[in-house]
């Protein structure tokens, strides 16, 4: 699928980029900053250094050049004076926008990339299994097909790097007919893989299935390690997990399957959702969802909305769900105000101090139970905080689902409090 080898033996220098975003009136400056910070995190994940960020207040991106002529001139002036390899935009660019922007930066030989291409590049870098590699390659070609501009047609002359981690590095002729044939081939290959995956899932149908879902980089893989007590790759990078990981776990004597799935993100490319159908089937066909949320992130509620919307989009929005607020050890309680004194403990000398972990969990539970219909648990998977409460909630749901499948499998008296064992430190 992807040839990641450099075209020469010398070590390549770190690539540099400037980031560009538009900010509609409904979007606060803080939101704009957070969105650009997320884009910068994507860029960092690919080993690229962000040199500068440009924003423009526009209700909608300019149909020709994404930003207005004045802002475009400002960016051109900057990249002409600074060592910049690429200009990256925080939205999908249309084929005509790509052509116009490439023309605007042609004299500087600067690559023009958008958010979807960055995400596809990260997925290409992370994919390990044949299924994931095929899914990513299909998504890449589907993205490439309407965008056969200078970026793609001259790939054989490029040195590779971010945005070039695709078929061009194999010196394939980027011709519409060839790409269309390749898309057809990959779809057929993926259909075969999907049928094999479906057969494997049917063989596992006798077990309750639990899927970890959530925004990218919220700690799903760390939580998987805690629950499964197994080695699962976890890293503080976006999309550290692309391939689904399945582990057999037991609660009491009831086994269930726990799946760590790919994280969601704002503006997830449609081609990825389509290509990752089989991977997302692990979520669609799960009996129970663990929706993991990084409560320490300032935009965690927006991230929850992104995940909820994506789950609804793939047909998994109505499943029994436990909302797992993770990273409570990093959570910063609201700044104290007169109306906010519940967030602090009052001492005898009327001074205040930050809430203890137990008190903080109590306040958070009170707040979110009033707003969410699902089970809500507050944990730190990294620090092993409050994991027993999560196991109890999850165990109850697994038992209920299991007995729906096998109502006479165990005597009623099998379960008692002694079956709940705390994880050893």
Where are these regions (language model features)?
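Switch/connector loops and helix/strand junctions flanking conserved nucleotide-binding motifs
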Residues: 27-30, 62-65, 95-100, 120-124, ...
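Short alpha-helix plus adjacent loop in nuclease-associated cores
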Residues: 116-136
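Conserved Switch II/interswitch segment of TRAFAC-class P-loop GTPases
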Residues: 25-26, 62, 92-95, 284-305, ...
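Switch I (effector-binding) loop of TRAFAC-class P-loop GTPase G-domains
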Residues: 2-4, 202-205, 227-256, 270-275, ...
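N-terminal accessory targeting/assembly segments
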Residues: 1-115, 119
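Conserved catalytic network of the ASCE P-loop NTPase/AAA+ motor domain
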Residues: 11-12, 79-81, 248-252, 257, ...
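C-terminal-of-GTPase-core extension/linker across diverse P-loop GTPases
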Residues: 1-20, 40, 146-218, 224-225, ...
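Switch II of P-loop NTPase G domains
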Residues: 2-7, 33-37, 60-77, 243-244, ...
